[in-house]
């Protein structure tokens, strides 16, 4: 399962933040997806394939161990691993609005180091979805 929460993203856009019960977490210095993460992503892929007007952003994060540069690289690789897996599950490349790593720039002090080795996914209404809603479709 997953929790969804309406949020403002880093660009102050309305988004739905998707948090999976199992988390999309990674081992130290790794961008390899766990079986739990793959199962969660397969469920997300089904939703994204049903509504191809939904765009997503994938943001990779790290703990604070190691250099800034190393953490930026690992966080990007984590985001790319999620993007590649979702594409392997049939999600259209056009749905990926943003795929990036932020290293430990957005480190969450309320989480443990292992919980900060994560990827966060945001879902957005596409331009077409917004136009359809405004037109009453």
Where are these regions (language model features)?
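Envelope-exposed proteins and targeting segments
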Residues: 12-16, 20-22, 29, 52-54, ...
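Periplasmic peptidoglycan-binding/anchoring modules of Gram-negative envelope and division proteins
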Residues: 3-4, 25-60, 87, 121, ...
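Residue-level preference for alpha-helix termini and adjacent loops
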Residues: 23-25, 32, 73, 106
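Short acidic/polar alpha-helix capping motifs at helix-coil junctions
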Residues: 7-9, 48, 71-73
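N-terminal targeting leaders that direct proteins to extracytoplasmic destinations
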Residues: 1-15
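Periplasmic OmpA-like peptidoglycan-binding domain that tethers envelope proteins to the cell wall
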Residues: 61-137
């Amino acid at each position: 399962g997953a929790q969804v929460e309406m949020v403002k993203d880093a660009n102050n856009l309305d988004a739905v933040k998707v948090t999976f019960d199992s988390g999309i977490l990674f081992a130290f210095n790794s961008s390899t997806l766990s079986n739990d993460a793959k199962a969660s992503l397969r469920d997300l892929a089904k939703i994204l394939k049903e509504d191809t007007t939904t765009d997503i952003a994938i943001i990779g994060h790290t703990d604070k161990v190691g250099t800034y540069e190393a953490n930026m690289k690992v966080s990007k690789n984590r985001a790319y691993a999620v993007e590649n897996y979702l594409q392997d599950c049939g999600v259209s490349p056009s749905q990926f609005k943003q795929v990036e790593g932020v290293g430990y720039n957005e480190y969450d002090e309320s989480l443990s180091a292992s919980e900060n080795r994560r990827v966060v996914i945001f879902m957005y209404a596409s331009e077409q979805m917004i136009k359809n809603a405004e037109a009453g479709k």
